[in-house]
Amino acid sequence: MTAEKIAELTGHGNPIFTLELSQKPDILFTGGNDKGLVEWNLHDYSFIKVMFPVRASIYAIHGPVGYPILLTGLRSGEVLVFDFIQQKIIKSLQHHLKPIFDIKSVSKKNELLIASEDGTVSVWSLASLEMVHSIKLSADTVRCIAISPDEKQVAFGCRDNSIKIYDLHDYTLLKSIHGHTMSVFTLAYSPDGTYLASGGRDAQIKIWDSAIYQPIKNIPAHLFAINHILFHPTKPYFATASMDKGIKIWGADDFKLYKIISREKGHPGHVLSINKLAWNGDQLLSVSDDKSVLVWDIKFD
């Protein structure tokens, strides 16, 4: 397996916390500590524009499939709804008073899940953009959301080190799982739905059987916090991004380490914490505290 840096998108003046690919091919959105959400062209790797200004740092961006909108979760607790057809912000979802850390949508139910530092997840109708439910998960932050491929269950990662599994039909708690010794920052179900991968401040990847949520494997994956775990859309691999400035690519079936992308390994990589990843085909995109977006071309053997 090889990894080659093919582009670097520069222009952000502050750390970048998150990114989201558009439903339109070759368009990327990024956000962080800057005063706006940025749109990029991945065909020629150029800056397009600042989509709209924001009053607080952007921690989460989400484009629900089939809806012409982009949701932006802010440090202030506000979620801005940008409409691509009208080319403007049409609504601000005002419920949370503390930072928004993750936003995901449930296609079958046409619902939106928003996780906050206030320890709750709010549930919204995608059709009306009205809140329909609130789940109190923890006394502390809910950092991340993962929805099972069959959309029957949802996992929430919390700062209290726990992972909470809920039934997506009626939002009842199915199981609370404990294994991490520190805050859980990222969760991802395998594309076939057989297991859940978790990572966080303790730098471990834990693999959980998604039928009974028992631990299958523990991988001492990074030197510092794992900020993101992301499965390749079609190939049996997943990538991890860490505060240790490295990206690692693992086998999704054998859990072997196949590639390390870091300066230590001779790659022109990030010089500060890597916060989020996105797969665009076999290209891996990464954003960092170092203010840059890097595009890696991954050749799988």
For the regions a language model picked out, list residue spans one by one.
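WD40/WD-repeat beta-propeller blade N-cap
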Residues: L9-I16, F52-I58, Q94-I100, K136-V142, ...
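Conserved strand-to-loop turn within each blade of WD40 beta-propeller repeats
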Residues: G31-D34, G73-S76, A115-D118, F156-D160, ...
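WD40-repeat beta-propellers
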Residues: L37-W40, V79-F82, V121-W124, I163-Y166, ...
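Short loop/turn segments that connect beta-strands within beta-propeller blades
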Residues: L42-D44, F84-Q87, L126-L129, L168-Y171, ...
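Blade-level signature of beta-propeller repeat domains, shared across WD40, Kelch, NHL, RCC1
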Residues: S273-D301
